[in-house]
A protein has these predicted regions:
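Glycan-recognition and catalytic cores of secretory/periplasmic carbohydrate-active enzymes
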Residues: 1-258
């Protein structure tokens, strides 16, 4: 019953894409309402947003978290792709500035999962790749300090979090690059593959990752959600969050391959 920023971010994302297709006023009104709720209820006044609120919209003092903020940025970008919207563009740029200040490790440029200084913090290679794609493919965000950071983060995440032989992407890393969770998740594989389409000189790696996704994760009845660190299937259900990652990955590949 709690109010999640993650959910509202995807409402914005979905409405923007749907409105682009149908141009129905009702759809745009839902988009506007979702944007207003985020601005009025979740915003903390410093460019960031609470990750979760109580069911009555009161604060839980949970603070901001990386993942819902990334999907909010994605929702803002989807909105700007279908209409001119100065308020949303300002919110997006303020978010990017605040993330650079509060979430980016200065040494490696990586986007941490929790704000800098939080206890038991970590970073996920998959999220570095996902952020890189969003930033590098956006005219609004390309060239910002956050874009420069995630360009560095891509290289560090690739070095420490991707197996050069199998193409496996590790789940969670400590800041020093040591593996905290070696679980291979299909969404991280898809995000790495999509991000590679924007990296010059990555054709050989792109082909390797395409094969790795096909051979290790996809099968005739769907997909393997997770493999363990040794490559054995560790999760057999197929959650509804995954097709979004696969669809956006395939879309990126289609644009890259023409």
């Amino acid at each position: 019953k709690r109010k999640d920023l993650y959910t509202h971010a995807f409402i914005i994302f979905a409405c923007a894409h749907y409105w682009a297709k149908v141009r129905e006023p009702l759809v745009e009104s839902v988009l506007d309402a979702a944007l207003a709720v985020v601005a009025e209820r979740f915003a903390t006044g410093d460019g960031l947003y609470e990750a979760v609120l109580e069911r009555n919209w009161s604060s839980l003092k949970s603070g901001p978290l990386q993942n819902p903020l990334m999907h909010l940025a994605e929702g803002f970008l989807a909105t700007l792709a279908v209409r001119e919207d100065a308020i949303t563009q300002d919110a997006l740029l303020d978010l990017a500035t605040a993330l650079q200040k509060r979430f980016i490790d200065r040494q490696h440029g990586v986007m941490m999962e929790k704000p800098l200084g939080a206890v038991d913090n970590w970073f996920e290679p998959g999220h570095q790749f996902e952020w890189f794609f969003l930033l590098d493919s956006s005219e609004v965000l390309r060239g910002t300090p956050l874009h420069a950071s995630l360009t560095r983060a891509f290289a560090y995440a690739e070095l420490k979090g991707v197996d050069k032989l199998s193409g496996a992407v590790s789940g969670m890393l400590a800041l020093d690059g040591s593996v905290r969770d070696g679980t291979q998740r299909i969404w991280a594989q898809a995000e790495y593959l999509r991000a590679l389409t924007l990296r010059p000189g990555s054709e050989a790696v792109l082909q390797r990752q395409l094969l790795a996704l096909q051979q290790n994760f996809l099968h005739e009845k769907g997909w393997h959600e997770c493999l363990d660190a040794k490559g054995a299937v560790s999760r057999r259900d197929m959650p509804s969050t995954t097709p979004y990652h696969l669809a956006t990955c395939y879309q990126g590949l289609i644009q890259h391959l023409g």
